[in-house]
């Protein structure tokens, strides 16, 4: 079995993938409604449908029911396992590869490893978020449609097709349509924006987590406690999430296929940034920052906690 060293532990690649996958599933289940609110807040242009995260969640629950807050969760739960597994395992592998002695911390090498992890994960992240965003934003578009229909009954607020199609899209339907009309590139719309967000995030997150976690390493066990790893993951995750929020806003706007009446479309990152700055002001770049911190902090706290508990190793031992 292929293995590499992480601190004083020998963790197999298989165990790392299992740990990352389990952590992703648990984390997404816990924080998905907040992520949905983040997407809807970031996509608001002009008149706001939602005043903030709490208002968004309350209106969503009333209009769409409890399950409405989990629109798009199936896509995330399906693909977050390989995504988080690749991200965590790639960072660990690259850190081992770049720091052969394993003793002295090197910030540049840690940042480079984080950069590599961000690049590796995007093969899953981009199509996953592409599909997830369409499902998450469907409820907001339905509200916009109803509001504009009440004001001008003959208006058509966005694209062609039936209202029910927009209200109840499915990931399979969206994926098939994108592949039919645009090919594989349709699923990778916003790839550049995704890289611009995920690479800086990983460059900030992984070195920051490693150094924060190192502060709690016990001399007896040679590793940090679960609680310390969890807190370190939450802290590093929230800092990195807020730092790259402007890039996440651009990515969300670019990947959103259907727009409400009067909402802008974008040809790329530069066009999106320019329109956002001139039409909505600099504050628009930080839309959903609080939601992102609340999503990413526990998501990566749980991820690192599970990773360091070593659930993957225990599962593999059951099959030995």
From Swiss-Prot:
Pfam families assigned to the protein according to its UniProt record, in alphabetical order: Mito_carr
Main location, first listed in the record: mitochondrion
Membrane topology qualifier: Multi-pass membrane protein
Localization per Swiss-Prot or TrEMBL: Mitochondrion inner membrane
Protein name in the entry: Mitochondrial glutamate carrier 2
Superkingdom: Eukaryota
GO cellular component: mitochondrial inner membrane
Function: Responsible for the transport of glutamate from the cytosol into the mitochondrial matrix with the concomitant import of a proton (symport system).
Catalysed reactions, as listed in the record: L-glutamate(in) + H(+)(in) = L-glutamate(out) + H(+)(out)
Family that this chain belongs to: Belongs to the mitochondrial carrier (TC 2.A.29) family.
Molecular function via GO: amino acid:proton symporter activity
SUPFAM superfamilies assigned to the protein according to its UniProt record, in alphabetical order: Mitochondrial carrier
Chain positions with Phosphoserine modification: 150
Solcar repeats: 11-97, 105-215, 224-313
Transmembrane stretches, start-end: 17-37, 66-86, 110-128, 190-210, 230-250, 293-313
Organism: Mus musculus (Mouse)
Sorted UniProt keywords: Membrane, Mitochondrion, Mitochondrion inner membrane, Phosphoprotein, Repeat, Symport, Transmembrane, Transmembrane helix, Transport
GO aspect biological process, one term: L-glutamate transmembrane transport
This protein's record includes keyword Phosphoprotein: yes
């Amino acid at each position: 079995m292929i293995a590499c060293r992480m601190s004083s532990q020998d963790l197999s690649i298989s165990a790392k993938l299992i740990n990352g996958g389990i952590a992703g599933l648990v984390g997404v289940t816990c924080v998905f409604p907040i992520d949905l609110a983040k997407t809807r807040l970031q996509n608001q242009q002009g008149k706001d449908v939602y005043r903030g995260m709490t208002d968004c969640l309350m209106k969503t629950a009333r209009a769409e029911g409890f399950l409405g807050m989990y629109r798009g969760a199936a896509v995330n739960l399906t693909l977050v396992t390989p995504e988080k597994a690749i991200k965590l395992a790639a960072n660990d592998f690259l850190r081992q590869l770049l720091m052969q002695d394993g003793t002295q911390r090197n910030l540049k090498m840690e940042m480079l490893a984080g950069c590599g992890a961000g690049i590796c994960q995007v093969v899953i992240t981009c199509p996953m978020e592409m599909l997830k965003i369409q499902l998450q934003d469907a409820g907001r578009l339905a509200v916009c449609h109803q509001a504009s229909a009440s004001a001008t009954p003959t208006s058509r607020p966005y694209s062609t097709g039936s209202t029910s199609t927009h209200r109840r899209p499915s990931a399979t339907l969206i994926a098939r349509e994108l592949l039919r009309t645009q090919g594989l590139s349709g699923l990778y719309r916003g790839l550049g924006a995704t890289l611009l967000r995920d690479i800086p995030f990983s460059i900030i997150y992984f070195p920051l987590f490693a150094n924060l976690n190192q502060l709690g390493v016990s001399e007896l066990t040679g590793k940090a406690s679960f609680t310390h790893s969890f807190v370190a993951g939450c802290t590093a995750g929230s800092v990195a999430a807020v730092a790259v929020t402007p890039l996440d806003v651009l990515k969300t706007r670019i990947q959103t296929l259907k727009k409400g009446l009067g909402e802008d479309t974008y040809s790329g990152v530069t066009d999106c940034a320019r329109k956002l700055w001139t039409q909505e002001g600099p504050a628009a770049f930080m839309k959903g920052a609080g939601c992102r911190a609340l999503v990413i902090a526990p998501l990566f706290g749980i991820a690192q906690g599970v990773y360091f508990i070593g659930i993957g190793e225990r599962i593999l031992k059951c099959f030995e």
